[in-house]
């Protein structure tokens, strides 16, 4: 795994301050250098540039990323196929209340099966072509049902992160139930991949009042269930630091579940617009762009073409790096320049 250099000194830093309707409302609207090459020394990244003074109120003003990196891009590849409930989950098909005599929804399950049969293998080849490393949020049951695929993800240099042992709403659990749930998630992923997860993503980002403290107790370094910033930051959980590497709804392929009023072309245009704005802001502010790819959605032929076009586009810009979320979290935890939120939501 490529590692970021030690955090830059703080001498020049500014003083630090002490699925469907839901996503349709939140997300509709509307290339990059690989971190491995960029940070290993054989990249085309430009030397560190002088940063223009940031306004006093600008979040995270001042230089942040090392080695001439201007903008970090963080990709989530959700490995959920095989971990979904047998019936009743979101899909392109109309909702049906199946009778008890119908134990599963075959049509929806074939849609999910595309994720592990075609989607992830196709995306892995795409990341390889561009030298991009991603973070794969893995449902434990999906990993157990398709262990070879989970191991292949890690073998190609990607991060295995937690996404629950199964598709469940953990916010409704007692503390003891949720602790067992989270522990099981760690065990299932580590047993198959050999990599112990240090990052976590709740189902639909819906965490409960005990989730963060439990993650911290279990040795997690970061979570992503937060949409409040375009950069990583630190919040306090039980008086101790816990890193947030924010997720995204706007740059999220889940909007394509229904296939109406949205398309791969719209997705491409949206992430390019997002990139352009964040790249511009990154001249004076620390910036991170998040993008989400689900196995059965972004792994389709037309979506891989859209992703490929975006990667080629971003490669035209100097100082852009794709980093795994564990890399981002470790750098954020160690850097004196990291934003420290006084509010923990």
Locations of regions flagged by a protein language model:
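N-terminal regions that are enriched for targeting/export leaders
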Residues: 53-111
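C-terminal domain-boundary segment and adjacent tail
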Residues: 55-58, 222, 272-345
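Conserved, mostly hydrophobic/aromatic
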Residues: 78, 127, 215, 245, ...
């Amino acid at each position: 795994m490529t590692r970021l250099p030690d955090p830059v000194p703080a001498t020049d830093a500014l003083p630090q301050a002490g699925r469907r309707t839901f996503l349709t409302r939140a997300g509709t609207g509307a290339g990059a250098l690989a971190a491995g090459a960029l940070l290993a020394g054989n990249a085309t990244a430009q030397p560190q540039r002088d940063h223009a003074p940031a306004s006093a109120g600008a979040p995270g003003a001042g230089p942040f990323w090392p080695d001439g990196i201007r903008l970090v891009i963080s990709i989530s590849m959700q490995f959920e196929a095989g971990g979904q409930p047998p019936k009743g989950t979101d899909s392109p098909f109309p909702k049906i209340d199946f009778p008890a005599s119908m134990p599963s929804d075959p049509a929806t399950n074939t849609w999910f099966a595309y994720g592990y049969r075609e989607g992830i293998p196709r995306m892995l080849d795409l990341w390889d072509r561009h030298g991009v490393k991603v973070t794969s949020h893995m449902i434990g049951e999906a990993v157990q049902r398709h262990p070879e695929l989970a191991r292949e993800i890690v073998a190609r240099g990607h991060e295995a992160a937690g996404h629950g042992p199964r598709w469940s709403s953990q916010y409704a659990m007692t503390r003891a139930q949720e602790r067992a749930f989270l522990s099981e998630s760690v065990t299932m992923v580590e047993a198959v991949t050999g990599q112990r997860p240090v990052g976590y993503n709740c189902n639909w980002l819906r965490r409960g009042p005990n989730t963060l403290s439990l993650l911290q107790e279990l040795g997690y370094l970061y979570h992503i269930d937060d949409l409040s910033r375009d950069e990583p930051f630190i919040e306090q959980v039980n008086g101790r630091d816990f890193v947030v590497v924010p997720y995204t709804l706007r740059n999220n392929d889940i909007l394509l579940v229904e296939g109406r009023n949205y398309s791969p072309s719209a997705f491409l245009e949206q992430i390019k617009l997002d990139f352009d704005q964040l790249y511009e802001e990154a001249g004076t502010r620390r910036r991170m762009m998040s993008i989400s790819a689900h196995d059965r959605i972004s792994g389709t032929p037309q979506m891989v073409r859209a992703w490929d076009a975006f990667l080629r586009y971003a490669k035209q810009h100097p100082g852009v790096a794709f980093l795994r979320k564990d890399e981002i979290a470790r750098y954020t935890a160690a850097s004196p320049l990291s934003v420290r939120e006084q509010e923990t939501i």
